[in-house]
């Protein structure tokens, strides 16, 4: 039996609790996606700074 | 180009490897937004035993137990087992008071023999926890940490995926009134935990389950023999590697925030980091057949994982080699030396800018609180050299000849900054030395301090010094979460 087939102890079936877990997961997923966007913006900002420096040096 | 000169150029550029790999790690952390384990998580509240090893922790243990029991987790599914490692202070009294106050929820276990270190105490606790079928999961923590209300729920949700063996959280430096050193540590954790562990999650291999917050499924601990390693100083890392090498996943959950009290002075920090550094050297040797084998498995054997592991481990050697090679180049080909000097420091500068800006995206709270230490993390002298290299590259101004003493100082700084950081630590206990110690650390940089500790850890390992566990003193200072 692989680990994927192992029965999971502690799984919750109460609908209210399941909904709460889902809401927490959605909230955390959104925050992680914001991190992705923020990192991309910062990377872009640094590339712009480098490009400006290179342009000034060549000018 | 002359082969000797070319070789020297390559060695000089090694001095820029750490910031490049560090930036890559932080950049990849953003991918965690698209690729994480959350979609496989589920509603899961296993019966959990919290194992807390405690040796003379009277200052903190009571508050820790109270906080654990007050967490947002069903009371009938949570027990706290304090493993009192033959404490000689009031630790037993503090725990026994909680045993009476919370019948059936707090267990006091006194070890048979004290002072053998955390791993031995943990093993006694794990044996007791696993002997009872009640335990479906075990949370291993340090005595001083404080969990935020929803932290345990956010960790257990990942155990809904049976492939997950262990979950760790985000340890944050949480002193309510932090000194400059605690702010440096907070900034370090932002990169080393919040960013690096997200990246490791993306790459499929976690380097270390934080000792202050590691949740294991019962199945995982049983597969590990119900014990953790006692032969190294890095039992957390060994547990992490063994979990993953046995085919189970180790997951980092950034929303599971845990506050910890970190060392308040350089001497205490030195002791703690020597232990970590030696542990990493021992782990590197132990898993020699695991590194850089991407064809066997992802994660721990991947190229990026190996690159980041060895860059941290070898960074002090790279810095010394880089400085020595640059000094030799300065003596034999100063025209080439200046070009490479600028290349190294401009690389440092670009990475530095990216790391500082990214910190505000990764953890705005810590970044806002500790931005001065973030800006001065590489040290004031290094920041000035970065500025100098940028001005030189763009305008060609402020040039100095190869034989000028300033040139030698600039070229040798990557190595000498470690000596200055070491001096900062030595001066700390000297009469009137505290101010000098602080000033030198800001000049040399906290990063240089971490490098010189790693170097000292090599030396201790090579000398075969005792694997003695040196406890980090906790004073029970108020934490942010409280």
Feature map (PLM): residue ranges:
Chain B
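Acidic helix N-cap motif at the loop->helix transition within catalytic regions
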Residues: 62, 89-98, 118, 150
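The conserved acidic donor/metal-binding loop of glycosyltransferases
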Residues: 142-146
